[in-house]
Amino acid sequence: MIDRVLLELNKTEGIKGSMVVGKDGLVIASQLPGSVDAELVGAMASAAFGAAERTAAEIGMGTLEQTMIEGEHGKTLMVDAGEGILVVLTDAKVNLGLIRITMKRAAEKIKAMF
C-alpha cells in the first residue's frame, strides 16, 4: 500500500525517487532509483531528520514540519509521516511549492496506514 503512494508521488515532475524510513533508520518502503543505496539513504535521512527535530525543539521552533538538504545536483526533502519519515529525492530545479504540497498529501495517506 505504501509503495502505491510512493509510485504516485514519483509521477510528480522533478521527483527522482521516494521512500519511507522508520524513525530508527530502517527502510519501510522504497521507490528509489537503482543507483541509490536505500538502506544507507534511509539511515542517514533518519539521523538528519532526528537532528533537525531536536534542533527545532531546542530553539523553540515547535514541531518540525520539514527538512531539506540542497545540493548542486538535487534536493532531499523529509517530512514526518507518523511512524515513519517520507523522504523525497528531486532534481536541482523543481517547483518546491508543488513538491511540498504533494509530499504533505502523501504523508497524510501514509500516516493513515500505520
Curated annotation (Swiss-Prot):
Coiled coil: none annotated. Pfam families: Robl_LC7. InterPro entries: LAMTOR2-like, Roadblock/LAMTOR2_dom. GO terms for biological process: cellular response to amino acid stimulus; positive regulation of TOR signaling. One of its GO terms (molecular function) is molecular adaptor activity. PANTHER family: LATE ENDOSOMAL/LYSOSOMAL MP1 INTERACTING PROTEIN (PTHR13323). To M.jannaschii MJ0310 and MJ0714. This is Uncharacterized protein MJ1340. It comes from Methanocaldococcus jannaschii (strain ATCC 43067 / DSM 2661 / JAL-1 / JCM 10045 / NBRC 100440).
